[in-house]
């Protein structure tokens, strides 16, 4: 179990960290800008939430396989490696981070940003000194939800990464494997770990959201 747990936590943490830069960029664009193609980006971001995870995994398999456009371009194997696990987790958890961060950015009073601009601050400085700190709690909540989603990812992972013990067998895949083998006791033990991690992540995320909406007293 420890090997499965360590692999799952490492890949989920890496996937969460890797989606932060593009996730925040997408969330900020959706929250603060009106531009041609915005609705297309909104749709693309939401797709992994509504598509069957296995369908997403099949798309990744075709893209990342040795005969796929991305696979041919890369000089190393991706499919059926821990890299495929990370990519599947990234794709499936990306929408949660974007949606949560977008709400956090939208709740930042634009007057603060405008005031900083009138004082000569650049867009980058406004973002890093005004927008980002004020939206930080919501962003952290989004990261926690994305991490929890990555921990529970199964459909896309099993298709693009498979079930290779010690290399691609994550917590969700291990639960499925134990059930298939009739080892229900082990499956329920793994299930308990998965539920505990998910509960802790969601509870903490909700705590950040609640604190963000609490009135501040001087």
List where the protein language model places each region.
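Glycine-rich helix-loop "coupling/hinge" segments at transmembrane-helix boundaries
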Residues: 61-62, 156-182
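Membrane-helix/interface signature in polytopic inner-membrane proteins
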Residues: 102-113, 123
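Short cytosolic juxtamembrane segments of multi-pass membrane proteins
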Residues: 209-218
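The alpha-helix within a helix-turn-helix
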Residues: 116
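Membrane-water interface segments at the C-terminal ends of transmembrane alpha-helices
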Residues: 1-106, 130-155, 178, 187-210
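Short coil/turn motifs that cap or connect alpha-helices
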Residues: 36, 122-123
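Glycine/proline-centered hinge or cleavage motifs at structural transition points of membrane proteins
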Residues: 119-121, 133
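Short, conserved catalytic or interaction motifs in soluble domains
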Residues: 49, 110, 162
């Amino acid at each position: 179990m420890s090997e499965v747990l360590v692999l799952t936590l490492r890949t989920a943490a890496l996937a969460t960290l890797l989606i932060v830069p593009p996730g925040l960029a997408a969330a900020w664009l959706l929250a603060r800008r009106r531009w041609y193609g915005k609705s297309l980006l909104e749709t693309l971001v939401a797709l992994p939430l509504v598509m069957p995870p296995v369908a997403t995994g099949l798309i990744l398999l075709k893209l990342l396989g040795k005969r796929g456009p991305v696979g041919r371009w890369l000089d190393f194997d991706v499919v059926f490696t821990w890299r495929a696990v990370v990519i599947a987790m990234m794709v499936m958890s990306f929408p949660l981070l974007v949606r949560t961060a977008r709400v956090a950015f939208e709740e930042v009073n634009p007057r603060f940003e405008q005031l900083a601009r009138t004082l000569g601050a650049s867009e980058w400085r406004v973002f890093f000194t005004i927008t980002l700190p004020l939206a930080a709690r919501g962003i952290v909540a989004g990261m926690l939800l994305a991490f929890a989603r990555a921990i529970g990812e199964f459909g896309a992972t099993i298709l693009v990464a498979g079930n290779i013990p010690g290399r691609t067998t994550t917590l969700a895949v291990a639960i499925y494997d134990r059930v298939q083998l009739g080892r229900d006791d082990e499956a329920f033990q793994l299930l308990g770990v998965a539920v505990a991690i998910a509960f802790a992540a969601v509870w903490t995320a909700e705590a950040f959201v609640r604190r963000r909406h609490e009135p501040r007293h001087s």
